[in-house]
Structures are given as C-alpha cells and as structure tokens.
C-alpha cells in the first residue's frame, strides 16, 4: 500500500486556522497550536453571545418602552397588560421603534391600553371590551 502524505491537506488546514486567527494578539495569530485553541474558544464565545445578544436587545426594548410609557403615567407592566386586554398584538421591537420615531402613534397605543384598563376596572371583565381589536 502506498504511503499517504498529508502535506497539502495539512497546509490547507493550518492556513484556514491561521486565517480565522487573524487579528489575534501575540502567538495566537501565528502558531498553529495556540491559534487553534484561540479560534475554538472564539467560536464558543460567538455561539454563546448570539443567544445573549437576543436577551440584551429584548431588555433594551423593554427599557425604552418603559421610559416612553412613564411619560404617559403608566408603567411598562400595566401598559403591556392594557395592550393585551385591548387585543393589540405588537411586539416589543416595534413598540420601542414607535416610541422613538413615531411618538403620536405610540401615544395612540398608550391611550388604547389605558382605555382597556379603565374598562376592566369599571366592569371587572375585559372579555366584552368593545374597543378590543380581534
């Protein structure tokens, strides 16, 4: 059986790792063993932080909505409850964007949420709320 020499494949593999390690500090950018470890760790961090990024954005949207809603005399939790009672289904990303770029439209949503909450307070039920969007 012929001897298999991996020179070309190994060189390509090393080149791929070093390309991924470009911009790293010290030996991590040009020594195969340390570069491979650094690249593997970087991939783990990237995987983890793609999940964390989603959490961070949701928290940011909630903070923005809370700040905007407090100008109208509501808290974030009461506002979301009012929107649910009114049957308005808008996600937090859109609400945050509306609060920043379209304050009039956001104000209308806050008014609808307040109306639904007041109706709930008066009647004790939100099932027959006529202002609900269904």
Curated annotation (Swiss-Prot):
A Pfam family the protein falls into: Ribosomal_L20
NCBIfam families: rplT_bact (TIGR01032)
PROSITE patterns in alphabetical order: RIBOSOMAL_L20 (PS00937)
HAMAP family with a match to the protein in the record: Ribosomal_bL20 (MF_00382)
GO biological process, alphabetically ordered: ribosomal large subunit assembly; translation
Cellular component annotations (GO), alphabetically ordered: ribonucleoprotein complex; ribosome
Originating organism: Rhizobium etli (strain ATCC 51251 / DSM 11541 / JCM 21823 / NBRC 15573 / CFN 42)
Protein name, UniProt field: Large ribosomal subunit protein bL20
């Amino acid at each position: 059986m012929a001897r298999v020499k991996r020179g070309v494949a190994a060189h390509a593999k090393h080149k791929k790792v070093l390309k991924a390690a470009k911009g790293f500090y010290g030996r991590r950018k040009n020594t195969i063993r340390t570069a491979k470890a650094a690249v593997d760790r970087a991939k783990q961090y990237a995987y983890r932080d793609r999940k964390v990024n989603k959490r961070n954005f949701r928290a940011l949207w909630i903070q923005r909505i809370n700040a905007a809603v407090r100008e109208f005399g509501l808290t974030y939790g009461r506002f979301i409850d009012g929107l649910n009672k009114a049957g308005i289904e808008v996600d937090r990303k859109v609400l945050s964007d509306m609060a920043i770029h379209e304050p009039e439209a956001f104000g209308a949503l806050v008014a609808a949420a307040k109306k639904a909450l007041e109706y709930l307070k008066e009647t004790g039920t939100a099932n027959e709320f006529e202002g609900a969007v269904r």
